[in-house]
Amino acid sequence: MTTRTVQRNLWASAAVVLVLLLLWTDTTGGYFAAIDETETSKNCFCELEGSINDCSCDVDTVDHFNNMKIYPRLQSLLVKNFFRFYKVNLRQECPFWPDDSRCAMRFCQVENCEEQAIPQGIKDKGEHKEKAAFKYTREAQVGGSACSDGEDFDSSLGFLDTSISDQAHREFELWAKHDEAEEDFCIVDDHEEGSQYVDLLLNPERYTGYKGESAHRIWKSIYLENCFGGNNETANKFSNYVPHLDLRNVCLEQRAFYRIISGLHSSINIHLCSKYLLSESKDFLDPQGIWGPNVKEFKRRFSPETTSGEGPHWLRNLYFIYLIELRALAKAAPYLRREDYYTGIAEEDDEVKLAINDMLSVIENFQSHFDENALFSNGIASIKFKHDYKEKFRNISRIMSCVGCDKCKLWGKLQTQGLGTALKILYSEKLNLATESGLWDKPHIEADPIFRLSRTEIVALFNAFGRLSNSIYEMENFRCVLR
């Protein structure tokens, strides 16, 4: 064999080895190839690590705390009768524009609640007896005399009429409502004509097909008309939202407001992606179709490529609103422990009260709560900010009446009311006064305490927090699929 032949064979062998090596490297590139920093940085979760801005907590801590301790407890609690029936007005007219965009899809409709399905204790709660002025009515005075009706006592001469006239009662009622509404961060409509009980288990929050101009108008109104706004208007289609870099140039109150709305928006989008209509074919588990996670839709809503780099920051804002509502539950814990959670079903009522106490203890032991005192702490300017917050959130709850999909409207109203209740708790002077005076430690509390939440507010608070908890849990599932 000549030298030339040997060299030719060696070159051929080397070429074969090189080709095989290249093929092998390509197929195993997931393990051995150099990591492309550009590629790894462009995923939905690239910002979900480290400290949560404006909070003394990090993402991993919240993930573990929620997924291991809070989410399982909420799953068993929110199916109970006290929390599954929510009273809401879905017939309220839109106060901002003609209601011209009704969703005709069957998934937009709310399934009516059977009257007999609602526990009697909820229906017969006697809402008027919760009002501050009730104790002055004639009804409240009947049978309330401590005096003897003996023969030596002329009741007609000694009777002290402690009741008030119907006209005065109505005026007291208006004063009481006004005083209570002063601390509200949302519009409460459960007492209005047209309000009804809705079974939340029959109407889960999931994809309905409601989209297009009507849906965009809702969020555009919330962001543009209610947000404090940024200085830089970007040219892309996400100019309705404040770019995260612009948030560095605004004060904490403005930044927190935007992050709360953005976090709520992200949470709702995660619900739609995790409970997506995959097929309208009837399934034995759900006659309305086959539902499940849609990874493609999740990436479309949150990946940097489709959101001009903002999607991962929107996901990060979910943790911010979660910590706000978590802190509200911790602050209201002494009050919430005094609630009866009454439905008239004694065994279940006892179970709910035990479950509430257990979850509140877990929440109170969380080490990195949001510091609500960081907001509105700048003297006179803070008074105006606090007033603006209330007006803006009340306006957002009005906008929810403009949603053209009844099921979307239901969950939008519930979550904005839950958020409003959380803010009411965090910034209520009455709650601060009651707590500082040791009111919740007393064995007996007067029928009309200085601070009070209605049943509807409590139901909204826990269910809204349940939605945020569910979003963080579902996000971990998407993260596992996209790794």
From Swiss-Prot:
<keyword id="KW-0676">Redox-active center</keyword>
<feature type="binding site">
    <location>
        <position position="301"/>
    </location>
    <ligand>
        <name>FAD</name>
    </ligand>
</feature>
<feature type="disulfide bond">
    <location>
        <begin position="44"/>
        <end position="57"/>
    </location>
</feature>
<keyword id="KW-0256">Endoplasmic reticulum</keyword>
<dbReference type="GO" id="GO:0034975">
    <property type="term" value="P:protein folding in endoplasmic reticulum"/>
</dbReference>
<dbReference type="GO" id="GO:0015035">
    <property type="term" value="F:protein-disulfide reductase activity"/>
</dbReference>
<keyword id="KW-0560">Oxidoreductase</keyword>
<feature type="binding site">
    <location>
        <position position="208"/>
    </location>
    <ligand>
        <name>FAD</name>
    </ligand>
</feature>
<comment type="function">
    <text>Oxidoreductase involved in disulfide bond formation in the endoplasmic reticulum. Efficiently reoxidizes pdi-1, the enzyme catalyzing protein disulfide formation, in order to allow pdi-1 to sustain additional rounds of disulfide formation. Following pdi reoxidation, passes its electrons to molecular oxygen via FAD, leading to the production of reactive oxygen species (ROS) in the cell.</text>
</comment>
<feature type="glycosylation site" description="N-linked (GlcNAc...) asparagine">
    <location>
        <position position="395"/>
    </location>
</feature>
<feature type="disulfide bond" description="Redox-active">
    <location>
        <begin position="103"/>
        <end position="108"/>
    </location>
</feature>
<dbReference type="InterPro" id="IPR007266">
    <property type="entry name" value="Ero1"/>
</dbReference>
<comment type="similarity">
    <text>Belongs to the EROs family.</text>
</comment>
<dbReference type="GO" id="GO:0005789">
    <property type="term" value="C:endoplasmic reticulum membrane"/>
</dbReference>
<dbReference type="GO" id="GO:0016972">
    <property type="term" value="F:thiol oxidase activity"/>
</dbReference>
<keyword id="KW-1015">Disulfide bond</keyword>
<comment type="subunit">
    <text>May function both as a monomer and a homodimer.</text>
</comment>
<keyword id="KW-0274">FAD</keyword>
<feature type="binding site">
    <location>
        <position position="219"/>
    </location>
    <ligand>
        <name>FAD</name>
    </ligand>
</feature>
<feature type="disulfide bond">
    <location>
        <begin position="46"/>
        <end position="55"/>
    </location>
</feature>
<keyword id="KW-0249">Electron transport</keyword>
<keyword id="KW-0732">Signal</keyword>
<feature type="binding site">
    <location>
        <position position="262"/>
    </location>
    <ligand>
        <name>FAD</name>
    </ligand>
</feature>
<feature type="glycosylation site" description="N-linked (GlcNAc...) asparagine">
    <location>
        <position position="232"/>
    </location>
</feature>
<dbReference type="GO" id="GO:0005783">
    <property type="term" value="C:endoplasmic reticulum"/>
</dbReference>
<keyword id="KW-0325">Glycoprotein</keyword>
<dbReference type="Pfam" id="PF04137">
    <property type="entry name" value="ERO1"/>
</dbReference>
<keyword id="KW-0813">Transport</keyword>
<feature type="disulfide bond">
    <location>
        <begin position="227"/>
        <end position="251"/>
    </location>
</feature>
<feature type="binding site">
    <location>
        <position position="265"/>
    </location>
    <ligand>
        <name>FAD</name>
    </ligand>
</feature>
<keyword id="KW-0472">Membrane</keyword>
<feature type="binding site">
    <location>
        <position position="206"/>
    </location>
    <ligand>
        <name>FAD</name>
    </ligand>
</feature>
<feature type="signal peptide">
    <location>
        <begin position="1"/>
        <end position="29"/>
    </location>
</feature>
<dbReference type="GO" id="GO:0051085">
    <property type="term" value="P:chaperone cofactor-dependent protein refolding"/>
</dbReference>
<dbReference type="InterPro" id="IPR037192">
    <property type="entry name" value="ERO1-like_sf"/>
</dbReference>
<feature type="disulfide bond" description="Redox-active">
    <location>
        <begin position="405"/>
        <end position="408"/>
    </location>
</feature>
<protein>
    <recommendedName>
        <fullName>Ero1-like protein</fullName>
        <ecNumber>1.8.4.-</ecNumber>
    </recommendedName>
</protein>
<dbReference type="GO" id="GO:0071949">
    <property type="term" value="F:FAD binding"/>
</dbReference>
<feature type="disulfide bond">
    <location>
        <begin position="94"/>
        <end position="402"/>
    </location>
</feature>
<keyword id="KW-0285">Flavoprotein</keyword>
